[in-house]
C-alpha cells in the first residue's frame, strides 16, 4: 500500500540527496522551503550510516531509503527488517530477486517496524533501472524481453507477492497504473523539468506528465539539488503539478 499523502503537491515530490556529504545533505534538506520527502541512496547511506535517517526524520522529513536490496531471501529479509526499524517510509528491493525473497521482505519489514514502534513501510520493487536502454538490456544481460514486457511482468510478480508498489520509468507509468490501480504505489525517477539536462537517465518525462500518466510520487535530484536556488526550483516543480 502506498504511503498516506496529502493533496499538497509537495507530498508528491521526493528530492534525491545523491552526491552530497552527510552534513551537506542535512543542511540542504533543512533549507529547502516546503520540502516533505527526501531520498537517501547508497552513497549517502554508506558514508553517513543509518543515523542519517534518524537525523532527517528529526528535521520533520519523510524518508525514502533507496538501497535496492538484492540478495538471497534471508539476507534481504534481515536487511529490510533493520531498514524498517529506522522509520524509513519507502524502501526499495529488486523485483528480480524473485517471489520467495519478495514475500520474505514484506513479512520482515512489518516485523521490524512493529518491534521498533514504527509504522510499516511501503516496499517498492525496482523493475528496470531508468539508466537502461532496451538494446543494452538485451545485448549485455541477454534478456530477450523488451522493456515494455519486462517491467509489467516484474510489477505483477511484486504485486502478487504483496509488495506495495514499484519504481519505474515515467514512460511505463500509464501501462502499470492500468494494470495496478491505487493504492499500489508508482514512484518514478527520470523526472526532468522543462529545460533540465537529462544526465544519466535514459527514459525521462516532465513532472506534470508523469503524474498524469499515473505516478504516485516523483523522484527529482539534480534539477533541484544542483539549482542555484533549490527552494525556487522545488516550488517550480510543485507548481507544475
UniProtKB/Swiss-Prot annotation:
The Gene Ontology CC terms held by the record are:
cytosol
Annotated keywords = Decarboxylase, Lyase, Pyrimidine biosynthesis
**SMART domains named among the record's database cross-references:** OMPdecase
GO BP, sorted A to Z:
'de novo' pyrimidine nucleobase biosynthetic process; 'de novo' UMP biosynthetic process
- Amino acids binding substrate: 18, 39, 66-75, 130, 192, 201, 221-222
Provide the GO MF annotations for this entry.
Answer: orotidine-5'-phosphate decarboxylase activity
- Stored InterPro entries: Aldolase_TIM, OMPdecase, OMPdecase_AS, OMPdecase_bac, OMPdeCOase_dom, RibuloseP-bd_barrel
Protein origin, superkingdom: Bacteria
- Quote the catalytic activity from the record: orotidine 5'-phosphate + H(+) = UMP + CO2
Active site, per annotation: 68 (proton donor)
Q: In which pathway does it act?
A: Pyrimidine metabolism; UMP biosynthesis via de novo pathway; UMP from orotate: step 2/2
Q: Which Pfam families match?
A: OMPdecase
- Sum up the protein's function in the record's words: Catalyzes the decarboxylation of orotidine 5'-monophosphate (OMP) to uridine 5'-monophosphate (UMP).
Self-association state and partner proteins as the record states: Homodimer.
- Similarity annotation: Belongs to the OMP decarboxylase family. Type 1 subfamily.
List the protein's name: Orotidine 5'-phosphate decarboxylase
